[in-house]
Structure formats: structure tokens, C-alpha cells
């Protein structure tokens, strides 16, 4: 159906697309320490699962959405140092002050995939 020239163009386009994605993909750098004293209201999240990677691992086997997390982190080239205890928030949604959260309210430093994975989270109380 396709001739050799069309196949070559499709192959070249596919290669260029993946090369562009590899270069343009952000790298997550999980911070440790920090002041942790303030959280902009735009960064407040309500996460279904919060914990270190090993703590969240139990949910990865049970929750269909969460099964993709190791693969997504691998694609991003992210390295999460389990020894440092970097806290992840999984399947999070943005909330505003005064809103309720039936799960865990957190403030996270890095948000990936529109809240599917959040890195460097700290639990907070919304009054």
C-alpha cells in the first residue's frame, strides 16, 4: 500500500518525534530539606495516595491508574532516591483553600502528568 519512499518518511518522522520528546522531556529533581514553611494556594493538592515510593508501591499493584507510575517515571528519566525518603503524591487534584479533601491534603514541589505523579510532597492542614 505504501511505497518505500513513504515508509522512509514515516520512519524518519517517527524517529524525529521520539528524539524531540527525549530532549524536551523534563527531568524531575526531588528536593530534600527546604523551608517547607509556605505553600502557594495554587500548589495545594488532594492526593489519593501519599508516601515514599516503597509505601506507595502497595497501591501500585491495586490501582489501575497507579500501575503506570514506575513506567512514567522511567520515561521521564527521573531518579527517586528511596533512601532519602522522597514523598510522592499519587492521583492528585488541585483544590482551593476552603475546599474539602477526602484523602490527603499536600503541597508538592513538582507536578507531573497533571497530578498523576507529584514529587516532594508535604502533608498540610487546611483550616
From Swiss-Prot:
GO terms for molecular function: structural constituent of cell wall. It is found in: Secreted; Secreted, Cell wall. Keywords: Cell wall, Disulfide bond, Secreted, Signal. InterPro entries: Hydrophobin, Hydrophobin_CS. The keyword Protein transport does not apply. Residues 1-24 form the signal peptide. One of its GO terms (cellular component) is extracellular region. Disulfide bonds join 39-107, 46-101, 47-92, 108-121. PROSITE patterns: HYDROPHOBIN. Pfam families: Hydrophobin. Belongs to the fungal hydrophobin family. Aerial growth, conidiation, and dispersal of filamentous fungi in the environment rely upon a capability of their secreting small amphipathic proteins called hydrophobins (HPBs) with low sequence identity. Class I can self-assemble into an outermost layer of rodlet bundles on aerial cell surfaces, conferring cellular hydrophobicity that supports fungal growth, development and dispersal; whereas Class II form highly ordered films at water-air interfaces through intermolecular interactions but contribute nothing to the rodlet structure. Self-assembles to form functional amyloid fibrils called rodlets. Self-assembly into fibrillar rodlets occurs spontaneously at hydrophobic:hydrophilic interfaces and the rodlets further associate laterally to form amphipathic monolayers. This is Unclassified hydrophobin 5. The lineage of its organism: Eukaryota, Fungi, Dikarya, Basidiomycota, Agaricomycotina.
